[in-house]
A protein has these predicted regions:
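N-terminal accessory beta-strand-rich subdomains and adjacent acidic, glycine-rich linkers
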Residues: 1-201
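Structural beta-strand/beta-sheet cores of well-ordered domains, especially the beta-sheet scaffolds
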Residues: 25-27, 52, 72-74, 173-175, ...
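Short, flexible loop/turn elements at secondary-structure junctions
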Residues: 33, 47-49, 80, 181, ...
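Generic recognition of flexible, low-complexity loop/linker segments
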Residues: 42, 163-166, 239-241, 291, ...
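Short amphipathic alpha-helical segments and helix-helix/interface helices
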Residues: 73, 117-119, 241, 292, ...
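An acidic-aromatic substrate-binding cleft motif
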Residues: 165-247, 251, 255
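Aromatic- and carboxylate-enriched substrate-binding clefts and catalytic-loop regions
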Residues: 256-436
């Protein structure tokens, strides 16, 4: 084994703290097959004050160039009977928008997918969360209770269930992370996930500016006290741009109107773009350059919503056009997967967006894994049940809000719509598409 100490300081643009000091002890344990072809892998373990992480490295070596992984084989054998706070999922393709379950480990259902981070509260004030860091060119992992242990389950490649990862050497798995503390609040403050990611790849980050934005989809593009109809038009966007400027906000977000995106598409709505959807064709009622020019004159930056499919189909042309218009960033939606291909696509979005000075907000996406250190143009990820659901169901409540900081938010910045200005008691609550209640 090879032992070493890792110490570094770095800054985050989006994260739990601006200035981070990371200190850990590392051991690399080389492993080799005892029979031909004598393949070698390394088990790498790091210990921090606030947790432990391990990963598998597949070094470049003679006679072994690539691999196909059917199962990773990682398992966690917990002692005792902790209380578990987790989100059960029906399958690997998910928006991760569900309610958390609190149960004793002994009573927890077997053979059900558990989302990460999952929280384990032991007696005597010992708290542990299991998640992963630096998920890159790999499949996302879930937990699965079976035979008294928690098994790591990888998201399979599309169209089949057996193959999880295909890679050429050298390669490495994400870090499998156990966040540990005797104070539950310390889990929230932990920066272990960003500590385990590579340094920033963007040389000049001066253009990356998180801020507050309008959310016109939420209220249905209403334009109070006006004489025009709200929708996919310049007056509606001007109305909100003026509101942003007047109230000292930063961004105006453009989504579309009534399930019609701001770009040309022939599908059934925002989540189902048709085969002719074209991210480069703005609907005739909008002039994107005019909107961006007006916003710039008012000191307001523009943020676009888009479904990931038409955007990825023309990623290079679209990002170049966005930069030409003066767009600051995007909400990329309905990804709903974390198989190896989608993990690669997400990183490609971040890397190419950075070249065109665009920030990214992943919506309908898997959990963060600290990649906002490497690509600080990643602002937030959704993947949570939040108050946008008040438009169509009654699932959100105070208990869910309290679970969030100790589960999903442990992984990083979260796109969590929390509340609204029109509230009703639960016994009088009603779902409403425009001007919704909470």
């Amino acid at each position: 084994p090879v032992f070493s100490t890792k110490e570094e300081t770095y800054e985050l643009i989006v994260g739990k703290a601006k200035h981070i000091h990371s200190l850990s002890k590392e051991v690399i344990i080389p492993l080799e097959e005892t029979v031909q072809p004598f393949r070698k892998i390394n088990l790498v373990v790091r210990a921090f004050d606030d947790g432990i992480a391990f990963r598998y490295e597949f070094p470049k070596q003679k006679g072994w160039d690539s691999y196909i992984m059917y199962d990773e084989g990682t398992s966690f054998n917990l002692q005792g009977n902790p209380s578990v706070t987790t989100l059960f999922l029906p399958n690997y393709q998910s928006s991760h928008e569900g309610k958390y379950t609190v149960t004793d480990y002994a009573d927890m259902d077997n053979k059900r997918l558990m989302d990460m981070p999952a929280l384990f509260s032991f007696p005597n004030h010992v708290y542990m969360a299991i998640t992963e860091a630096a998920v890159r060119d790999y499949a996302g992992m879930y937990l699965w209770k079976e035979n008294g242990a928690l098994l790591g389950k990888l998201s399979p490649k599309l169209g089949q269930e057996r193959i999880k990862v295909e890679a050429s050497l050298p390669h490495q798995s994400p870090w499998r992370v156990l966040m540990i503390s005797d104070q539950i609040g310390s889990l929230i403050a932990s920066n272990i996930l960003t500590n385990l990611n590579e340094p920033c790849k963007i040389e000049d980050t001066s253009w990356i500016k998180p801020g507050k934005t309008t959310f016109t989809w939420w209220n249905g593009n209403v334009v109070p006290d006006t004489t025009f109809l709200g929708g996919n038009n310049f007056p509606t966007n001007k109305y909100y741009i003026d509101f942003v400027a007047r109230n000292g906000l930063d961004y105006h977000s453009i989504y579309g109107n009534a399930e019609q995106a701001w770009y040309d598409e022939d599908g059934a709505g925002f989540g189902s773009p048709g085969p002719k959807a074209d991210i480069l064709k703005v609907v005739p009622s909008l002039n994107m350059q005019e909107i961006c020019d007006y916003a710039k004159s008012q000191g307001v930056r523009i943020h676009l919503w888009t479904n990931w499919k038409p955007l990825y189909a023309k990623i290079d042309e679209a990002f170049a056009q966005f930069e030409k218009w003066g767009i600051a960033g995007m909400m990329i939606d309905f990804m709903d997967r974390d198989d190896q291909e989608m993990i690669r696509i997400q990183e490609e979005f971040l890397a190419k967006a950075a070249k065109h000075h665009l920030f990214v907000q992943f919506h309908g996406a898997c959990k963060p894994s600290g990649l906002n250190r490497t690509y600080p143009n990643e602002f937030t990820r959704e993947g949570t049940l939040n108050y946008e659901h008040c438009k169509w169901d009654k699932d959100t409540d105070a208990d869910h809000d309290i679970h969030m900081p100790f589960t999903r938010l442990l992984a990083g910045a979260t796109d969590y719509h929390l509340g609204g200005f029109r509230s009703l008691p639960r016994d009088k609550f009603k779902n409403q598409e425009r001007n919704p209640y909470v």
